[in-house]
């Protein structure tokens, strides 16, 4: 149960357009005032709740509007939070090895990701700039520099948005407009037969330069996740089957995955065979036990009447149950 400190969440009309649905700020009624875990954000429409710090330090999540120091509530769009949760499903925590690790070390070359609570346990170093509204985490192996002027020229410049750009000490690069003009000219000069190859590689490079490559791959993975859900629900269409078949077997991109999947099949086969052997051993043990019980009955060690009755009560208990007192018999007669 939490105390509500914001109006109900939902799309808000602003001059004919809809602003993004935002998370509601709640305060845990059982936490002490001011505790870092007491502030929770909740989205009733999506049934999602998250701690404030888990949201603030998530590498791929930013607020959907400028933070107002006079308003303690944060502006987290529900759509962005759902996207970050989905992104975290593919990230394993460097400490607990479980999914959902959206808090990454802010050094671009470091691959460590945490849950916020695991980052604290691992003594990760937080870096907060209230004026800029940035919340960063550095793993213990990569403590942050005290001043930007002390960083090396080839060190990365990191932003809260999760888009990391390395500074280059090499020759100056061409402006983007010039690059794009050259790209269009090359497109016109390429023969038709090589046009597809000329388009695809530069297209992905342009996505990278525009900071949209991650967005593109996230949409691809989201599409795959949606198809996977339909397969699990047994609602997949014929086009879903054809699409996955083409992706896996026709394009050759996932040949290594199929080879690894063969190893998974072998491993599962061995696992189930081992289970089957264990079940056979248990069945044999039960059969031996039944045979021993039968031999005890033949030798008179067990009362046949007791074994056929299907009850574990001693014989005297059966007699007590069967012999009713005169009062009980009289009562039963009266009831009739």
UniProtKB/Swiss-Prot annotation:
Composition-biased stretches (Low complexity): 303-314
Signal sequence segment: none
One Gene Ontology MF term: zinc ion binding
Tagged with keyword Metal-binding: yes
Function description: Positive regulator of Th1-type cytokine gene expression.
Assembly and binders: Interacts with BRCA1 and RELA.
Annotated organism of origin: Rattus norvegicus (Rat)
Gene Ontology cellular-component terms listed: nucleus
Gene it is expressed from: Phf11
Gene3D superfamilies noted in UniProt: Zinc/RING finger domain, C3HC4 (zinc finger)
Protein name, per record: PHD finger protein 11
């Amino acid at each position: 149960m939490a105390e509500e400190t914001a109006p109900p969440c939902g799309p808000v009309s602003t001059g004919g357009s809809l602003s993004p649905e935002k998370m509601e700020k709640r305060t845990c009624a059982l936490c002490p005032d001011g505790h870092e875990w007491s502030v929770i954000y909740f989205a009733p429409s999506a049934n999602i709740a998250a701690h404030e710090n888990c949201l603030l330090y998530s590498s791929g999540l930013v607020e959907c509007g400028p933070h107002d120091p006079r308003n303690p509530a944060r502006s987290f769009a529900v759509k962005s939070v759902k996207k970050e949760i989905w992104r975290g499903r593919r990230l394993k925590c460097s400490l607990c090895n479980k999914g959902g690790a959206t808090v990454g070390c802010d050094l671009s070359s470091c691959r460590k990701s945490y849950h916020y609570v695991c980052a604290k346990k691992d003594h990760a170093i937080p870096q907060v700039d209230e004026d800029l509204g940035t919340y960063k985490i550095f793993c213990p192996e990569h403590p942050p520099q005290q001043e930007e002027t002390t960083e090396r020229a080839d060190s990365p410049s990191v932003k809260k948005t999760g888009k990391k750009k390395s500074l280059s000490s090499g020759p100056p690069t061409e402006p983007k407009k010039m690059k794009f003009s050259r790209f269009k000219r090359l497109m016109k000069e390429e023969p038709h037969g090589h046009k597809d190859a000329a388009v695809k590689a530069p297209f992905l490079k342009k996505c990278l330069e525009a900071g949209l490559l991650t967005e593109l791959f996230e949409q691809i993975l989201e599409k795959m996740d949606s198809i996977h859900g339909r397969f699990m629900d047994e609602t997949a269409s014929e086009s879903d089957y054809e699409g996955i078949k083409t992706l896996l077997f026709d394009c050759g991109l996932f040949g290594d995955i199929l080879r690894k999947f063969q190893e998974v099949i072998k491993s599962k086969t061995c696992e189930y065979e081992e289970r089957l052997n264990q079940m056979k051993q248990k069945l044999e043990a039960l059969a031996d036990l039944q045979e021993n019980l039968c031999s005890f009955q033949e030798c008179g060690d067990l009362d046949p009447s007791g074994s056929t009755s299907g009850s574990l009560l001693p014989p005297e208990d059966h007699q007590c149950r069967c012999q009713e007192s005169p009062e009980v018999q009289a009562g039963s007669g009266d009831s009739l």
